[in-house]
Amino acid sequence: MKYKKKIFSILENLEKKNIEKDIINIKNLYLQKEKYVTQLSLLKDYQNEYLIKLKSKIELGICLYQWRNYNNFIFILYFLIKDNEQKIKKNQKILEKSLKQYSKNQIKLKTWNYLYKKYKKKEIKKILLVEEMISDEFSQLKNLAEGSCYNV
């Protein structure tokens, strides 16, 4: 029966390690998401700033090559913003998966804890039962030994 105790403790330790890995993974994903969101806001700010500059330059008169440069830069910013938004969505999906896995591992850990506690209670009952049987046998032998003295 000792092997059951070892199995439960091994399974419990495995789940604890899985939970720790999940927590680290979730923290990293949150940090990545935060980084992407700040990048996105910076890119949008740059885009708005350059759109305002381009508008004012157009009103004042702008050379064709300057207009192309501004337009190309704003176009590149547009694609960078779209790419960053896709990264945020992908990160969010991975984060949701990781949170689900974390909750599954928590449930497994609670299950192993419950089964281990149930096993311990059962083992304690067995030990108490054996002790009670030994005590009963001892008292029976003691009574028989005392009774045999009177029969002689």
UniProtKB/Swiss-Prot annotation:
Membrane topology, record value: Peripheral membrane protein
Keywords: Bacterial flagellum biogenesis, Bacterial flagellum protein export, Cell membrane, Chemotaxis, Membrane, Protein transport, Transport
GO terms under cellular component: bacterial-type flagellum; plasma membrane
Predominant localisation class: membrane
Plastid in keyword set: no
Superkingdom in the source lineage: Bacteria
Disulfide bonds: none
Cleaved signal peptide residues: none
GO biological process, one term: protein transport
UniProt-annotated location(s): Cell membrane
Family recorded in the similarity comment: Belongs to the FliJ family.
Physiological role: Flagellar protein that affects chemotactic events.
Matching PANTHER family: FLAGELLAR FLIJ PROTEIN
Protein name: Flagellar FliJ protein
Recorded name of the encoding gene: fliJ
